Structure formats: C-alpha cells, structure tokens
Amino acid sequence: YLGEKLLHEQDLNNFSWSIHAGADGSVSRRGWEVYSGSGNEDYFEPAIAITHNDGNPSTILYYVSSSSKAVDGGTETVINLRDDKYPVDVTLHYVAYPKENVIKTWSEIIHQEKKPVMFSTYASTMLYFNNSAYYLTEFSSDWAKEAQMSSQQLQFGKKVIDTKLGSRAAMHTHPFFEVGLDQPVSENQG
C-alpha cells in the first residue's frame, strides 16, 4: 500500500493481503514481499542475494519505516527495510507521476559488515502482477534501423532483455521495454 497513512489500524482489513503461493494452495497463505531476499520461503527469484562474510546466503528484510513527499509532478514514497541478523539496509524509492501514469523506482543497498560481502543479485525493484496475460514490447536496432519495435505475448518462463555494450547500449540491443497487462501496449497504456 503506497497511499496516505491510514487513520485506524482496522482499515488494514480493507486490503487483500494474502495469496496462495502455489497454484494448488499447498503453501500457507501470505502476502507478497516488496523486495524479497535470498533464503526466505518465496519461490520466485529474489530481488537481492547477498553472501555475508560468514558464508550465510540468507537475507531476510523487515519493514522499518516509510515516508512520502511531493516531488515535481508526483509523489515519492520511500520504504526502509533492514535485515535483523546482519547490518544490511535497503531503501526502496517509488516516484509516481499520476498525469503520465508512470512509476519510477530504484533501490539503495547499504551493508556495514566488517568484511566484504558478495552480491550475486540486486534489483532496482520487484514487481508482482496478477493478470491472465502479459505482452512484451521491446526495441532492437542495427545500422540505419534504430529502435525497431517488436511485441509478443509472454509465455511461462524467464525473458531476459540485456546488453553488454555498456555506454553503447543504444547501438544494437536496447535494454528498454514496455509490458502490457491483459493486452498489448498502446500509446496510452502499458
């Protein structure tokens, strides 16, 4: 929930927090993690995976605080998370631009362990959608064929949009995409 602060604790009952983790309902009901760490009971790929300096690969983040403030054209919400076993803090930033119907997000990860740690996964965000169909629009290019748009319905599995060109990413494989929920993207949605 990224809206205004609730006035009464019982207002939480108006939100649908629980889901079945397995299609057959074989796993206990629980909510989705906003930024899942490795080693918890989520079956999806974690947003963050750290091997701590003692060799433990688990990171379980807990809610610490949140705040919202007005920014140019929208609202920024900041969520602070912390591991209760290791000195790891994650700050999630969400900037919502209502006029454009766009959400910008990024994360900041800070560790204060006395020895180096190993990050094997770190994501800017972790988004969950619960729709019946998803459509991907991506861009590719070549010489004199810049930003060629193509779309496809996504099927089960992982789709990777990647480029190894660094600052030259715009030359061939753009790491940019749009996702359509239940329908292909269009000029006004996706």
Q: Where in the sequence are the language-model features?
A:
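Polysaccharide-binding surfaces and accessory modules of carbohydrate-active proteins
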Residues: Y1-G190
